[in-house]
Amino acid sequence: MPHPTDPVKTPASLLTLIDEGVIDEVVRPLKSGKEAAVYVVRAGNDVRCAKVYKDMAQRSFQKRVQYQEGRKSRGSREARAVATGSRYGRRQQEAEWKNAEVDALYQLRDAGVRVPEPHGFFHGVLVMELVTDAEGFTAPRLGEVELDEAQAREFHAVLVRQVVRMLCCGLIHGDLSAYNVLVGPDGPVVIDFPQVVSAAGNNAARTMLLRDVNNLTASLGRWAPDLLDTWFGEEMWALFEAGELQPDTVLTGQFTFDERTVDLDGVRDAINDARELALIRQQGREEAQYED
């Protein structure tokens, strides 16, 4: 017999949550990506969202290896299984991949980072706050809104501070861009953390941090071009490595490269290329949305 919410092809995991009383209704699909599908759900009088993670077979395994470097397994048996690549190890790695976002949300929320409020993790489904705009509609992504110069500067300052707070928690988003930031009535909200990176344990941590900051700078620099001449990522990473970065550390956006050990022109060219690529990708997304 069909379930009463089946007209929207509700995933079995959400039907389980309905049967267990965690949620009362699946309202509609919100979005579907490579890693997960997100649904608007109702729990009592509250409207929330439920993130249903896709199975390992539907996602890129090799891509996840780089992000998972440095993450702690929950026990020695699990660590050995992951290392040997056994079936149990792959299941354990899958569980760790899903749990990483849940753990990060709680940790970052407690550290003052503006993320969706988590409401629990049930049967592989993350139930959390549905971020809305001032009118109560689903909040747009940062890459979908037009800003004036003052707003762009304000949002950039807010997001740089969020990245600093994440880094002080030992975490790097790993895939941060204008399309992983929602614009709520109180400002930017950072979303999507399944690929969260260990700042101390991942050899690519610095590269990923700089990419995150450069993506934001390239996007917001469209509205406030002088942001493109700032070096917040390099500055905060240097302070982090020196053990001097605090959640409220005042940053200048200026950074002096050591020309004795660094190819300064090469570094600047690489960063500018990354920012240009981020801008090109954003423009491509906007054109695709316009065509749709």
Where are these regions (language model features)?
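Catalytic-loop of the protein kinase fold
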Residues: 168-178
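A glycine-rich phosphate-binding loop feature that marks nucleotide/adenosyl-phosphate handling sites
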Residues: 124, 180-183, 233-239
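Regulatory N- and C-terminal appendages and interdomain linkers associated
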Residues: 1-29, 150, 154, 158, ...
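Conserved ATP-binding subdomain of kinase catalytic cores across diverse folds
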Residues: 3, 7-138, 164, 168
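Short, surface-exposed loop/turn motifs that are enriched in glycine and acidic residues
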Residues: 91-94, 145-152
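Amphipathic alpha-helical transducer elements in NTP-driven molecular machines
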Residues: 95-102, 156, 206, 210-213
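Catalytic activation segment of kinase domains across protein kinase-like and atypical kinase folds
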Residues: 44-55, 61, 132, 138-145, ...
